[in-house]
Amino acid sequence: MAAKDVKFGNDARVKMLRGVNVLADAVKVTLGPKGRNVVLDKSFGAPAITKDGVSVAREIELEDKFENMGAQMVKEVASKANDAAGDGTTTATVLAQAIITEGLKAVAAGMNPMDLKRGIDKAVIAAVEELKTLSVPCSDSKAIAQVGTISANSDETVGKLIAEAMDKVGKEGVITVEDGTGLEDELDVVEGMQFDRGYLSPYFINKPETGAVELESPFILLADKKISNIREMLPVLEAVAKAGKPLLIIAEDVEGEALATLVVNTMRGIVKVAAVKAPGFGDRRKAMLQDIATLTGGTVISEEIGMELEKATLEDMGQAKRVIINKDTTTIIDGVGEEAAIQGRVGQIRKQIEEATSDYDREKLQERVAKLAGGVAVIKVGAATEVEMKEKKARVDDALHATRAAVEEGVVAGGGVALIRVASKLSELRGQNEDQNVGIKVALRAMEAPLRQIVLNCGEEPSVVANTVKAGDGNYGYNAATEEYGNMIDMGILDPTKVTRSALQYAASVAGLMITTECMITDVPKGDGPDLGAGGMGGMGGMGGMM
């Protein structure tokens, strides 16, 4: 076992605070509308430029192991805030630094660390309740656009795109962010259900100008099996031909004789058919086939439940107003499934989302909900260079998370004003003893830190602005972008309540643990090893007399 280096008391806390300050000072330059960028050196490729707090925090590793422990604990604050709300990482880091700095001063002055922590926790619990009372619902497009704009570092185009996307696919819809091909940002909305499977044969194409298959009011056959024998298909094909409608076959696979016969029938104009593979694999494929069945009012033909393809009738088929199939995707528009059945299926999947343990499963389930509920929006980010594209994409991603958080828990006045108002309301809060009262004061003083840092990044005097804002009430605050005072909500400067709440809770949680630290243990750095000196191989000393 490696030897350990142990530090106690003030020695440990000073080292830890130094690490906290290095990380927080690097992160907090990005805060606010006039925050600066940070350039990150990468081991390969061009350097990355970012204004995202958590991206900066993740890059920091310090040489001194004790200082690094302090930095890593604050990195945890940024990561947790990012996981919970998708934004507010810089605010969380600034709050953590403020609580730790003030808290360690109190410890050095002889206060009891455990009582300080209890005081901080009490203040944060009360602050969260106050934030809830200050919160106003965020339901209209204008408010959503404002939240998106603030979170994307005052980029109005991004805010408007996100609001437009939410209008089109609903608040619960799936919105994804992708690299664009031009200089402008674009919004692409896929209505209906789309999945990543294209036609099985190019001979099905009936729109040569677009290279796509378009079927109007088709029957949709859903089969959870491979189809290779055409005899299984004959009753279905005959029934569809009599009905005079096209047919879409979605199956595990269609191959050999069955595929060849379908192609020949299509080319001769006997029946208009197209075949695609079912989306997904294994259990997920079964579930997605069931989703399509619910959307189109059909039944999945599966031998597991005793259904055979030869006995399938038109009643077992799904139907839709239109189907478009190209090389890579299939889109089903306006399925005829009953609304109640679709909502029931959506409710079922939402229950699975709540119980899902992995992010991947959750993401896939959310995609299924969106496909059933109305569509998917894709924001294509445009930029002149790859470096700018990466930076912008990270901002759009942050803005998207922030708007979702705003829809979920509402919004409060931005620019650090909400925390200032909360601190003012809690000025009479008291603990069980004097040390707890100091802990409460530490937390309330720290709540001014985000506003002070935003002002500092503008090049103004933080104390002057903080005192002016404190003298006002309600949503009165300082607009750092225009350097004016006024009503923050009216000026469109909003923060999602969830983002502010998460930042405060995670900052206080980690800061409380660090204030109560009395001892730090780490491995002793390994030396360079014994100096073997010049000379040949070991054991050859004394061989010089061989001449």
UniProtKB/Swiss-Prot annotation:
Single GO BP term: protein refolding
Alphabetical UniProt keywords: ATP-binding, Chaperone, Cytoplasm, Isomerase, Nucleotide-binding
Main location: cytoplasm
A UniProt-annotated Pfam family: Cpn60_TCP1
Gene this protein is translated from: groEL
Protein name: Chaperonin GroEL
GO molecular function, one term: ATP binding
CDD domains: GroEL
Record-linked PANTHER family: 60 KDA HEAT SHOCK PROTEIN, MITOCHONDRIAL
Catalytic activity: ATP + H2O + a folded polypeptide = ADP + phosphate + an unfolded polypeptide
Native species: Enterobacter sp. (strain 638)
Assembly and interaction partners: Forms a cylinder of 14 subunits composed of two heptameric rings stacked back-to-back. Interacts with the co-chaperonin GroES.
Protein task: Together with its co-chaperonin GroES, plays an essential role in assisting protein folding. The GroEL-GroES system forms a nano-cage that allows encapsulation of the non-native substrate proteins and provides a physical environment optimized to promote and accelerate protein folding.
